[in-house]
């Protein structure tokens, strides 16, 4: 195996793994960053409807309650996210009663600096489709396309690459067409003693060429651009019979006189 072939195979495997990983993620929500989200406040405000749906706080009681409940929501909890490179980011997630908002605080400013985020950029959150406790975070620049179409495009491209990889040098349509056409021809002419041979390591016929084979008064015209095995003769009534397999339809013309001779021979 050549070095280039090895690297190409490894690259295809790596891209396939990435495509599978992306397909296993479920988009939760995204937010366009405000100046305060990337400013000196060092916090990201999570829209309330998304926060309560996807990141519910334990012992959360926003409508009043004991001092312990309020202290719990203010303290919050740690949320862990994986970025596009697989790196883990941990943020302090809590509810601020003063502003009645859900926020990511500790760890957020480091993420902003690492990704060089500015106001107008977008952050989006995802979750694993099967492991619901596994969360992901990503970002894109202002004006770039949404993440959902990107996932769709990757999935379609992966499908095309997979088809091209398994098909190799064989055209899938021709492979199926030949396999479905072959049994009918074999059954039709098997009683004449025709021999069917598997086509392995057989030179192809030049495209555009045709060949006519006469079989008991039947002219079989086989068009080119097909792979056909070498003829195998069989003997029926001291006559040599040749069989040619082809995935293309055959033009059959009957010679009445020859058929009558065959009938007389059988009688």
UniProtKB/Swiss-Prot annotation:
Provide the GO biological process annotations. glucosinolate metabolic process; regulation of seed growth
The Gene Ontology terms for molecular function here are: DNA-binding transcription factor activity; sequence-specific DNA binding; transcription cis-regulatory region binding
Recorded hits in CDD domains, A to Z, give:
B3_DNA (cd10017)
Has keyword Glycosyltransferase? no
The family database entries (SUPFAM superfamilies) matched by this protein are listed as: DNA-binding pseudobarrel domain
Instruction: Name the keywords, alphabetized.
Output: DNA-binding, Nucleus, Transcription, Transcription regulation
- The answer, when asked if Nucleotide-binding is one of the entry's keywords, is no
Give the GO cellular component terms, alphabetically: nucleus
Q: Where in the cell is it found?
A: Nucleus
Residue intervals annotated as DNA-binding region are: 29-143
What superkingdom does the record give? Eukaryota
> Which positions make up the signal peptide?
none
Matching InterPro entries: B3_DNA-bd, DNA-bd_pseudobarrel_sf, LEC2-like
Protein name stated in the entry:
B3 domain-containing protein At3g11580
Q: Which organism is it from?
A: Arabidopsis thaliana (Mouse-ear cress)
What is the organism lineage in this UniProt record?
A: Eukaryota, Viridiplantae, Streptophyta, Embryophyta, Tracheophyta
């Amino acid at each position: 195996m050549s070095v280039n072939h090895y690297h190409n195979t490894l690259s295809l495997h790596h891209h396939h793994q990435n495509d599978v990983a992306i397909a296993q993620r479920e988009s939760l929500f995204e937010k366009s960053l405000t100046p305060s989200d990337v400013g000196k406040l060092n916090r990201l405000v999570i829209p309330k409807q998304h926060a309560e749906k996807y990141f519910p706080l334990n012992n959360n009681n926003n409508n009043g309650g004991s001092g312990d409940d309020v202290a719990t929501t203010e303290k919050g909890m740690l949320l862990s996210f994986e970025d596009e490179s697989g790196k883990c980011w941990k943020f302090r997630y809590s509810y601020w009663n003063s502003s009645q908002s859900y926020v990511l605080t500790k760890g957020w400013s480091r993420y902003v600096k690492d990704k060089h985020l500015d106001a107008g950029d977008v952050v989006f959150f995802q979750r694993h489709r099967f492991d619901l406790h596994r969360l992901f975070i990503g970002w894109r620049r202002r004006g770039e396309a949404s993440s959902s179409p990107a996932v769709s495009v990757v999935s379609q491209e992966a499908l095309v690459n997979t088809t091209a990889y398994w098909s190799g040098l064989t055209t899938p349509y021709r492979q199926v067409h030949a396999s479905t056409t072959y049994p009918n021809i074999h059954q039709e002419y098997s009683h004449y003693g025709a021999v069917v041979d598997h086509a392995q390591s057989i030179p192809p016929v030049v495209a555009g060429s045709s060949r006519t084979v006469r079989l008991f008064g039947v002219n079989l015209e086989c068009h080119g651009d097909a792979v056909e095995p070498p003829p195998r003769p069989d003997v029926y009534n001291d006559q040599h019979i040749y069989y040619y397999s082809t995935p293309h339809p055959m033009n059959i013309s009957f010679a009445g006189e020859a058929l009558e001779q065959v009938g007389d021979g059988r009688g």
